[in-house]
């Protein structure tokens, strides 16, 4: 026995030494060589486990804002083509339409807003004979015409009226943007009731016209100053502090009651996922006066494109605090826009943002900012735009941006009434950066290489959208289904069906968006 031990002890020692060395090398690779880890995670094959029994939020749909461009599209020779691309079944089939109640920058002779796309006609106009302001619903005619055309295609079931600023005659500085004292709202308290009456009167007009107006959003991005610099004076906007927000909502509730109007409030459309968003959501949700007239809570997911922890944190909070009212991500675009109009990079960011907002943030709907935007020429002489469509000044020429197809991967396959279900990956491909702040380690960047979300449709299909920011790899599925149809978008081909047959492992192309429909 002693001889055996004499032989075994050195052998075990050698094996332990080798094991420690290997583990040490592996540790060094994983924890010190970040580039190696990221490279491996961006090329590793993926297996998704999709569990239709783990259900989340029901989907109310997808949409875009008509702000800044519908009045241009409404007088363009390409009006019908643009409308069909966005709001018909042949196009994106969007069902949510955000109509901007303009603050009158196109009517105000003293405005500093010079861009004709950003100027708005108001329904509240000066009668030069009487010297009084009155309502004229023949105004904003081109934007109304475009809305009517989009409604005629039958996809829209939700119209949201939103205002970036009160009418310029109601503001402190007589402008549609904030005053120099950024911490003071440009809407004085004595005009809250007048502003509420103005909004609800306009809503009543659209409802009587037969437009399916569900919500009115009186406040938009109250976080920002909208006037301290000349940059902020280039578009309509208004700062509000917390008490301002709550009192404006109360004024709107009072007006809705008086008019006995079948409409609810949305908002307050925080411009980012930050601490104010939580404060505003919680107050509006729990206020006994406002709550019965609150139809949905709305926010914008700007400045979190690579801060997935913000989206996860919001989703966890909503799950705990907001139990019986819809939450909508009501505005996002690529900001600042660094992707070319025809680049897959813009589409990947668009799709990744949509997938993560839907998968992690516990929302019921997702709405893009501008459906159409102008074309900007960068310092490199190339064309940039954050719109789903991009065109020249009068939209006599336009093109479909690559990010349009990103939206199509969701809106054309996931109908209203679908329910989010659980999707798990077999790889940990997170990139995370932490910094020390006030003695604590704080996450400043967090993102995945492969992002995905799945829905169970009303007719029993499972739809999964996968966004691959990495290299070509294999993807396999564990799902209660027998057949699947697969559609991909890459730089070379958009919305191309690449497979139809039994559920199987397939190739996930590099830098691609993939929609899989399981049956």
Q: Whereabouts are the PLM-identified features?
A:
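Solvent-exposed beta-hairpin/edge-strand motifs
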Residues: 480-494
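Conserved, mostly hydrophobic/aromatic
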Residues: 64, 93, 159, 216, ...
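N-terminal catalytic cores of secreted or lumenal carbohydrate-active enzymes
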Residues: 41-214, 218, 236-241, 246, ...
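Active-site neighborhood of glycoside hydrolase catalytic domains
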Residues: 194-212, 222-335
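Carbohydrate-binding surface patches
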Residues: 427-482, 511
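Aromatic/acidic polysaccharide-binding cleft in carbohydrate-active enzymes
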Residues: 326-412, 421-432
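C-terminal beta-strand-rich structural cap/linker in extracellular carbohydrate-active enzymes
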Residues: 499-519
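N-terminal type II signal-anchor transmembrane helix
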Residues: 4-35
């Amino acid at each position: 026995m002693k001889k055996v031990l004499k032989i075994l002890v050195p052998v075990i020692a050698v094996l332990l030494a080798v094991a420690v060395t290997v583990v040490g090398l592996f540790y060094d690779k994983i924890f010190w060589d970040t580039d190696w880890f990221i490279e491996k995670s961006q090329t590793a094959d993926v297996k998704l486990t999709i569990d239709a029994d783990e259900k989340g939020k029901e989907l109310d749909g997808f949409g875009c804002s008509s702000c800044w461009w519908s009045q241009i599209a409404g007088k363009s020779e390409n009006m019908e083509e643009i409308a069909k691309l966005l709001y018909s079944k042949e196009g994106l089939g969007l069902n949510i339409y955000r109509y901007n109640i303009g603050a009158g920058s196109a009517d105000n002779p003293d405005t500093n807003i010079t861009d004709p796309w950003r100027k708005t006609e108001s329904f509240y106009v000066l009668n030069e004979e009487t010297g009084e302001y009155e309502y004229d619903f023949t105004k904003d005619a081109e934007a109304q015409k475009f809305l009517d055309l989009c409604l005629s295609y039958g996809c829209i079931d939700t119209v949201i009226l939103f205002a970036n600023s009160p009418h310029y005659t109601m503001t402190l500085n007589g402008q549609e943007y904030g005053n120099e004292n950024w911490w003071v709202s440009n809407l004085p308290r004595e005009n809250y009731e007048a502003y509420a009456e103005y909004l609800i009167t306009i809503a009543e007009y659209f409802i009587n016209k037969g437009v399916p107006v569900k919500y009115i959003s009186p406040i938009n991005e109250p976080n920002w100053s909208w006037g301290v610099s000349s940059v902020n004076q280039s578009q309509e906007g208004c700062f509000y502090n917390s008490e301002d927000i709550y009192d404006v909502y109360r004024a709107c509730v009072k007006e809705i009651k008086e008019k006995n109007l079948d409409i609810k409030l949305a908002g307050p459309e925080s411009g980012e996922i930050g601490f104010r968003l939580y404060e505003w959501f919680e107050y509006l949700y729990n206020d006994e006066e406002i709550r019965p007239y609150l139809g949905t809570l709305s926010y914008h997911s700007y400045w979190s494109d690579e801060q997935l922890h913000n989206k996860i944190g919001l989703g966890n909070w909503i799950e705990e605090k907001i139990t019986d009212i819809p939450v909508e991500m009501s505005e996002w675009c690529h900001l600042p826009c660094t992707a070319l109009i025809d680049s897959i990079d813009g589409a990947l960011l668009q799709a990744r943002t949509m997938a993560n907002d839907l998968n992690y943030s516990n929302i019921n709907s997702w709405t893009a900012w501008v459906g159409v935007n102008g074309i900007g020429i960068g310092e490199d002489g190339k064309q940039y735009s954050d719109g789903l469509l991009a065109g020249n000044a009068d939209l006599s020429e336009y093109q479909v941006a690559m990010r349009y197809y990103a939206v199509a991967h969701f809106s054309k396959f996931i109908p209203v009434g679908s329910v989010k279900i659980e999707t798990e990956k077999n790889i940990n491909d997170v990139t995370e950066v932490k910094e020390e702040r006030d003695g604590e380690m704080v996450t400043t960047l967090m993102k995945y290489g492969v992002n995905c979300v799945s829905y169970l449709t009303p007719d029993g299909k499972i739809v999964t959208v996968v966004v691959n920011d990495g290299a070509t790899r294999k993807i396999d599925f564990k799902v209660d289904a027998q057949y699947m149809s697969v559609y991909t978008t890459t730089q070379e081909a958009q919305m191309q069906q690449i497979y139809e047959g039994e559920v199987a492992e397939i190739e996930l192309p590099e830098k691609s968006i993939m929609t899989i429909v399981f049956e």
